[in-house]
Every structure is written in structure tokens, then in C-alpha cells.
Regions:
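Ligand-binding pocket segment of bilobal, Venus flytrap-like solute-binding proteins
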Residues: 8-89
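Hinge/capping helix and adjacent helix->loop/strand transition within the periplasmic-binding protein
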Residues: 1-43, 92, 97, 104-137
Length: 176
């Protein structure tokens, strides 16, 4: 349908992560999206619920209540693995599209930080991220835990930066 017809795709703002994610999905699939930018995801979700737009690109946490109530349906996730909260929903990769885009969070320190301090911080935060309280919080808020060491996280940032730069260029946006 989306390859033959334009789909109005709401997102959280021009150049925002979910605008870029939808652009990546369109690029990979050949779908035609009319990007409808909002000031945050809430307006896009409200307009989707009111059937004023056809779809949204947002994090699952932002729509979980509507999915659980049956008001919205998730077609695919842009993560590299399925989400525990919606295990029957495939990833884009499983659907045949190389789209792994989204948000992440991490801890950074100055480059001059001694290695032993970096290792201690990694261990402290790694242990905390595996604690029952944190895992429970992340599960309840429908977020994914992906613990990476410094070099792995740096690789992820660099790879994502390359992807997002290409999407920004494709969209004709200026990096500021």
C-alpha cells in the first residue's frame, strides 16, 4: 500500500529521531511518506488516534497504553531484536528491511579520565542496570536494556552518526 500510495507519517519534529527513523524506513522499503512534524510525539499520537494521519514513528513506550487497550497496532519495531512487551511483533529486519534505528542512552566521561575510573564506572552502572529494581522499571516503561562497554558504545555512536548524517542529507536538512 505505502509503495503505491502516500502515507501520512507523524513524527516528533523535523530532524528529530523519529523523523529520521521514518525516513530510513521509507528509504529502505520504497514507501512514500508525507512527513507530518509535531512538537513532540503526543500530538502525532493524538492525531493518529483521531485518524487524521495514517501512522506514527515513535518509541513503543509512548504508545504502549494505546496498544494494550487495542486502540493502536504496532506493525514492526526498529530495534535489532523483538520487544518483550510485544513479542509477536517482528523487527523490520525480520520483515526483510535493514532498518535498526532509535534512541539510546549512555554515560560519557572526559577523554582524560583514567582507565581504572572508567572501568569502575562501567562496573557500577552495569551492575545497576542489571538490578531487579532497574530491570523492573525499564520493563514497566517498555524500554530495552542493552549494556555496552565503552568501545562497543563508541562503535554504535559512530555507526548511528553515519546513518543519521545520510538521512539528514537525504531529507535536505542542515546539520547545526
Amino acid at each position: 500500500y505505502a509503495k503505491e500510495n502516500e502515507v501520512s507519517m507523524g513524527n516528533s519534529g523535523n530532524g528529530a529521531i523519529w523523523h529520521l527513523a521514518a525516513a530510513g524506513l521509507a528509504k529502505e522499503t520504497g514507501a512514500k511518506f508525507k512527513h507530518v512534524a509535531y512538537d513532540g510525539a503526543a500530538g502525532a499520537i493524538t492525531d493518529l488516534l483521531g485518524e487524521h494521519i495514517d501512522a506514527v514513528a515513535v518509541s513503543y513506550a509512548e504508545v504502549a497504553n494505546y496498544v494494550e487497550s487495542g486502540d493502536l497496532k504496532v506493525l514492526a519495531v526498529m530495534n535489532d531484536k523483538r520487544l518483550d512487551a510485544i513479542p509477536d511483533v517482528p523487527t523490520c529486519k525480520e520483515a526483510g528491511y535493514n532498518v535498526v534505528l532509535g534512541t539510546w542512552r549512555g554515560l560519557g566521561v572526559p577523554a582524560s579520565t583514567p582507565d581504572y575510573v572508567v572501568e569502575q564506572l562501567y562496573q557500577i552502572f552495569s551492575d545497576a542496570a542489571q538490578s531487579d529494581a532497574f530491570v523492573d522499571f525499564m520493563n514497566k516503561s517498555n524500554n530495552v536494556i542493552d549494556i555496552m562497554d565503552g568501545p562497543s558504545f563508541e562503535d554504535r555512536i559512530i555507526a548511528d552518526l553515519d546513518t543519521y548524517k545520510a538521512l539528514v542529507t537525504d531529507l535536505g536538512l542542515k546539520i547545526q
